[in-house]
Amino acid sequence: MRRADRLFQIVQLLRGRRLTTADDLAQRLEVSMRTVYRDIAALAQQGVPIEGEAGVGYRM
């Protein structure tokens, strides 16, 4: 999966749920948790309003 497609998928997954963990995103996208962390950081840098709580998960 290309990175652009993965970033789009992350946004879609976060929109449809209350809280989503990095582990859940990694399993759904078949990537490492480190890749999820990098992708979340890239989205946040682009201005996507993602909120994250350590040990809890991410939401939009």
Regions found by a protein language model. Give the residues of each.
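Short, basic/aromatic recognition patches that contact phosphate-bearing ligands
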Residues: 1-60
